[in-house]
């Protein structure tokens, strides 16, 4: 048993310490073997041997705890030395990159602000008028349904799009107006391409009637999409939105397959990226504007980020998996 103490004294790390412990105190260790020998003894000889085993076992356990404490302190000191940072040296610490959503937001803002668009920020909590009625969304519109919108008890709601910011801006300012707004929006969806909270960016331009035409809208959108995606092809399609008339949706040539056809573009070669149109007169009437015209556009920031970062699952943006976030 003195050999166990001698082995313990020579231990230099946690691995060796564990090996000595198992050899001494394990189910097949030295002390277990000694206790098994008691069954072959009898009388006073058995009691004396048992007392001796307990004495040595207690001595070993005490020495083991002391050695364990010393080893842990030594290993901690060595680890701290390795992890020590010399603040006088050049900063070689790896810094994180911008989150894909922040990168996308900043890139959008960098395009529009030099063109004279003012960035407006609005409240996340809205009322029915600013979120629905002023935007020509009738009472029977499915977007008003409890299954699609988060409502509060006082008839307030979490905005379902950033369009209410446009309404507030028109109420607080007079034409000419040139603004963009971006931020969080909320809807009752959660799957590969939808999350309960997502980000939108919208733009609005309003001036005296006749000063703003669809050609102005088309020019801005085409310049932006070529700036953001590079040399992609564009396709305009007529569409319907209650708050714009006429309305259009814009597609870009698939950035994944170069229009050869893939699962992402449903083998069509095209990807939808935004909606736009000339502001419906019903919206201007709700605000109290007269003799004005304007255009508006809107797009999902996650949608743009998914295309540029080639991400298939929208939920990846909101999960804290560093392996995913560090890959961008």
Curated annotation (Swiss-Prot):
HAMAP family to which the protein is assigned, alphabetical: Phe_tRNA_synth_alpha1 (MF_00281)
One GO CC term on file: cytoplasm
EC numbers on record: 6.1.1.20
Highest classification ranks of the organism: Bacteria, Pseudomonadati, Campylobacterota, Epsilonproteobacteria, Campylobacterales
Top-level lineage group: Bacteria
Keyword ATP-binding part of the UniProt annotation: yes
Identification of the protein by name: Phenylalanine--tRNA ligase alpha subunit
Main location: cytoplasm
Annotated source species: Helicobacter pylori (strain P12)
Subcellular location field: Cytoplasm
Positions bound to Mg(2+): 245
């Amino acid at each position: 048993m003195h050999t166990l103490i001698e082995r313990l004294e020579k231990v230099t790390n946690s691995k060796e310490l564990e090996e000595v412990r198992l050899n001494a105190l394990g189910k097949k260790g030295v002390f277990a073997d000694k206790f098994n020998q008691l069954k072959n003894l009898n009388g006073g000889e058995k009691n004396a041997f048992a007392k001796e085993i307990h004495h040595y076992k207690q001595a070993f356990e005490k020495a083991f705890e002391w050695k364990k404490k010393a080893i842990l302190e030594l290993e901690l000191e060595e680890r701290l030395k390795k992890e020590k940072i010399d603040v006088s040296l050049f900063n070689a610490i790896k810094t994180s990159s911008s989150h894909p959503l922040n990168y996308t937001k900043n890139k959008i803002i960098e395009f529009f602000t030099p063109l004279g668009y003012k960035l407006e920020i609005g409240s996340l909590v809205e009322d029915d008028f600013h979120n629905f009625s002023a935007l020509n969304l009738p009472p029977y519109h499915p977007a008003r349904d409890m299954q699609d919108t988060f409502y509060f008890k006082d008839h307030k709601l979490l905005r379902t799009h950033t369009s209410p910011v446009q309404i507030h801006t028109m109420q607080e300012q007079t034409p000419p107006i040139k603004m963009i707004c971006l931020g969080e929006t909320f809807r009752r969806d959660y799957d590969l391409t939808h999350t309960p909270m997502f980000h939108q960016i919208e733009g609005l331009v309003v001036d005296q009637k006749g000063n703003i035409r669809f050609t102005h809208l088309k020019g801005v959108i085409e310049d932006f999409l070529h700036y953001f995606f590079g040399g992609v092809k564009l396709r305009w399609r007529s569409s319907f939105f209650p708050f714009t008339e006429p309305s259009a949706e814009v597609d870009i040539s698939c950035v994944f397959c170069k229009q050869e056809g893939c699962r992402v573009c449903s083998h069509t070669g095209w990807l939808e990226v935004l909606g736009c149109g000339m502001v419906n007169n019903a919206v201007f009437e709700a605000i109290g504007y007269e003799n004005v015209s304007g255009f508006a556009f809107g797009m999902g920031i996650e949608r743009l980020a998914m295309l540029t970062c080639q991400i298939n699952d929208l939920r990846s943006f909101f999960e804290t998996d560093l392996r995913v976030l560090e890959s961008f």
